[in-house]
Curated annotation (Swiss-Prot):
GO terms for biological process: regulation of DNA-templated transcription. Gene3D superfamilies: Winged helix-like DNA-binding domain superfamily/Winged helix DNA-binding domain. It is found in: Nucleus. SMART domains: FH. This is Forkhead box protein N2. Its main location: nucleus. The keyword Cell inner membrane does not apply. GO terms for cellular component: nucleus. Residues 381-390 have a biased composition (Basic and acidic residues). The lineage of its organism: Eukaryota, Metazoa, Chordata, Craniata, Vertebrata.
Amino acid sequence: MGPATGMTPDKNIESPTAEKVPGLSQTENMGSLPEEVGAARPKASMVDNGATDEELTNLNWLHESTNLLNNFSLGSEGVSAGSPLYDIEGDLSPSGCQTPEKLSASSKPPYSFSLLIYMAIEHSPNKCLPVKDIYSWILDRFPYFSTAPTGWKNSVRHNLSLNKYFQKVERSHGKVNGKGSLWCVDPEYKPSLIQALKKQPFSSALALYTPPTSPTSVSSRPYVLTSASRRKQIHYVKDSDIDAATAMMLLNSSIKEEALDRQKPQPLKVVLPKKRSYASAFKHCPPLSLQENDGEVINIDPKEDHNYSASGGDSQRCESRSSVSSLSSVEEVYEFIPKNSRTGSDGSEGFHSEDDTDIDYEEDTLGDNGYVPQPSGNDLHGSKLRKEASQDIDEELKEAAGSLLHLAGIRTCLDSLLKTAKAQSHKHRK
């Protein structure tokens, strides 16, 4: 096989043997290299003599281009937008580098918003800035944000309000005139911000963004990041931004849940005590228990909620007063009359409800036989409650009887007055 035709006249390379052809064809068919190969080989030419097995590529460009592998990134298709092979319009630049103006305008700074806010505040003479001045500082130092969507301003505000690194300052400590709040760095969390800034892979940017020692350093132009430092910064995790975003999401979700809980009514099931026999009406006085759907008993503090009574005795008193004063039915009145007043001369009880159980009848028979149980703490407490309830009932009955007697007296007086008036009228007629 003769020398390959179509080569450049100043390069004479013998054609490789047939064993090297498969390796060259694999290099030619690689899917992740075509655009980079076409951009970085200025002297490459193709061999075209009509046969597919004789089409060989000049490989001199591999020795001339030394920065080829630096432009590749694993897991990406083609060339990334921040690659030095691209300019602002996206065209391939043959020089393989960019000017600082093009880089600063097209690339996003590798700092988190908390670090940007920290640097802006530290560059101020009073170490405190309003939100508008923070915006202007970021726009002056990083022209990328002048063409970026306006959502970055919301991120700055969220970091100021939700991040623990920053706090509001009283207006007297900073600017006297103007509107809006002043923000400064919390001294407690300032070392952590400095440590996060030291983790940046470029030392020159660190030297520039440390707090200034003179007013001249405040007005100095910031360091423009190179493409290599930007590629190193791609894998940097912005912890503070993630924390601020998660805090904002949690805040929104908690507000929505509270609004839904307020709108949704919570039904409470009132569990009334089981109806007992009239003999044991005052033996057990359990207070009414309010239960939710899950069956748990709600313990309500009387100091917090004034709609509920503080003890079971008070609830029994309220219940007894309402039932006696209303006089809705004979059973309700009879249920609150003491046992001694309900027993007859022969010691027999009055009528019983149809819902009484066998246990209630057993308790009644024990009470008729004169069996006295041993006193305990619960019995003493129940006896106190019964005494108080009976005293209240007696007072209510006395008041009702007095009112009835008063009405009866008024009636008798009216009757007597009418009789005397009729008698006098009869006398006058005669």
